[in-house]
């Protein structure tokens, strides 16, 4: 049984799955059509994404900063948490990876 947060996150990821190329390597990276290497913030209240340098996903009451783009173009993991692991799973599932 999915929680409301899990359901809404998966729904949001499905909205952008067709427009994004995901690369699950040592560094998490992707290119968005028309805006390469852009990160997104998912706003649960407005059910939409906002472009940002840092990917922030709001889970429960806190915001977890999962990845940050470095000047070299690589990505740095800012935290390895159970929430981050769940996020990876949702993204992979939503993007059929």
Task: State each model region's role.
Residues 1-49, 69, 73-74:
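Negatively charged, low-complexity tracts enriched in Asp/Glu with abundant Ser/Thr
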Residues 47-93, 97:
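Intrinsically disordered, low-complexity regulatory segments enriched in Ser/Thr/Pro
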